[in-house]
């Protein structure tokens, strides 16, 4: 961000009735970008990246705000993701400052399309990305993980496994989880990462196949190929399935009892 800019996240907090300091966060980002991330004047629609995730968060809030939960649910639409995960860092810092016990962060980023750049369509899967041990861990930390666990059982990985089982058990949704054991896609990032950096369990939901012509692109047509992240490229029935999986996961985690002392 080249000039001082006020960063605004849109956050709704549904307080828990029994353990309000235990928190589940569902989030997406409301900003978008064109081909040049520094171009702040050109039209830059972001239907899939990430209006799809924002719509998911709003629908989750509409449905779940009619219920009560023992733990707190936070619905967050974050700013500045494309400029360096700024809104995610702001909310993660706030969670730390407030002393929240964050049970899970469900980050939804690019969840509304089912067709890839090569025309292959997959509306039966959603990827869930989760970070394990850091590659730059110290020798002391590696030794500790070997002794006490952690090589492949990080809290984020366990959330991924659990969400996959949740989807598997509900065959009516028509959606299976493809677990990706990486922090994010190759060379990419998302607002789950600032939470992972602070030790909070966090995963990212994203589409099964990448459509590079319709993300981070100026609106144009080249060689008969249309570029740009526009609403006509969305698959709303697919998005609805991802919404339902998120809502089911959120309800279960928000209702779960605390760990035994």
Predicted regions and their residues:
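Active-site-adjacent mobile loop/cap segments within catalytic or ligand-binding domains
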Residues: 113-129, 180-257
């Amino acid at each position: 961000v080249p000039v001082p800019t006020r960063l605004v996240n849109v956050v709704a907090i549904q307080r828990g009735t029994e353990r309000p300091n235990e928190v589940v966060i569902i989030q997406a980002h409301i900003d978008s970008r064109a081909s040049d991330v520094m171009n702040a004047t050109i039209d830059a629609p972001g239907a899939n990246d990430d209006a799809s995730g924002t719509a998911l968060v709003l629908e989750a809030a509409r449905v779940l705000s009619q219920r009560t939960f023992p733990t707190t649910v936070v619905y967050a639409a974050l700013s500045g993701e494309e400029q360096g995960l700024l809104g995610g860092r702001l909310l993660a810092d706030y969670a730390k400052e407030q002393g929240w016990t964050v049970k899970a962060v469900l980050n939804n980023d690019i969840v509304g399309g089912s067709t890839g750049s090569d025309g292959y369509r997959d509306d039966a899967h959603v990827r869930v990305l989760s970070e394990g041990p850091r590659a730059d861990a110290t020798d002391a930390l590696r030794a500790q993980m070997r002794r006490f666990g952690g090589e492949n059982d990080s809290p984020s990985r366990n959330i991924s496994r659990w969400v996959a089982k949740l989807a598997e058990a509900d065959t009516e949704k028509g959606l299976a989880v493809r677990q990706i054991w990486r922090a994010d896609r190759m060379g990419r990032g998302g607002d789950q990462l600032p939470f992972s950096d602070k030790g909070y369990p966090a995963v990212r939901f994203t589409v099964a196949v990448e459509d590079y012509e319709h993300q981070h692109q100026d609106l144009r047509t080249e060689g008969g190929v249309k570029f740009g992240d526009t609403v006509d490229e969305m698959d709303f029935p697919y998005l609805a399935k991802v919404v339902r999986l998120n809502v089911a996961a959120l309800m279960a985690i928000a209702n779960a009892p605390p760990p035994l002392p």
